Amino acid sequence: KGEQKTLKVTVHPGNAYVRTITYATSNSSVVTVSRTGKITAKAPGLVKITVTADGGKKIKNTIQVYVRDKKTGTSNAPLSGSSGTILHRGLSLEAPENTLPAFSLAGQKGAKYVETDVRQLKDGTFVIFHDSNLLRMCGVDKRIENLTYQEVKKYPVITGTNASAYKNNIIPTLEQYLQCCNKYSMTPVIEIKSNLDQNGVAKFNQIIKKSRKSPVVISFKEEPLIMLRQINRTVSIQWILRDQITSAALNECARYKFDVSAQYGCTNRATIARAHSKNIKVALWLFTDSRIADCYKNWGTDYLTCERMM
């Protein structure tokens, strides 16, 4: 707070014609920016600075500026201390994402929440896998939902962090993931990736009852979440939004007793407060900088999804 910095803009190629360069702040009460690109910290918080170069065609770039209070080192909201840190696809910075080694390492490091992705196979088995195709993680061009689990086991995970250290790293089932969560007393956070029908949702609901900790079920797909809520009135459900948390989205969440999940860059302190006023919890993703995560914790975010322990 109180510091000033001047943004440096580099034009490529060096001989390119640029008529004007303009600057804009998303919140002038936190940070102001002058016509020459000098930014001044006014209050603790997080803002976006947009730089626009106009040379006949406008090109924009955005940076985030985080302001801490000089005295306390935090934003001006008191630290709630209640935010839950969710590890994204296990400890994926130390083992391949969404594998039993990644989940086990998360548990060994003391993770309380571990997120994963679930898909239903041709034979009805639920497996832990993010992509619709095996190519990125297993090296074969096959759509996973067109396979049975016996077929999936032929293609172990061969890429990802330290993949060579984990031979025959088979894609786990949902049951195996829950067993790992139970072993380390972690709360499962499960994203539904498949377009489940009523039978699929019913089977999924039966499986997650094997979790000792009450799971959190999340998805971009609203329909399976609604079907799950109709048969399970108590499970925690988060509807993931692709853009900002709108009033319409909050009304929909209130209707079905959902919480809400969104990218942190699309969310501000006022939005979090508005959700809380409707008794809706807020989960934000995907944090890689502990300073930014700290800011959102101070704003009362209920869950923060991160790549590492924060």
Please annotate each region the language model reported.
Residues 1-74:
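Extracytoplasmic soluble-region selector
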Residues 48, 68-310:
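Phosphate-group recognition and catalysis centered on beta-loop-alpha active-site segments
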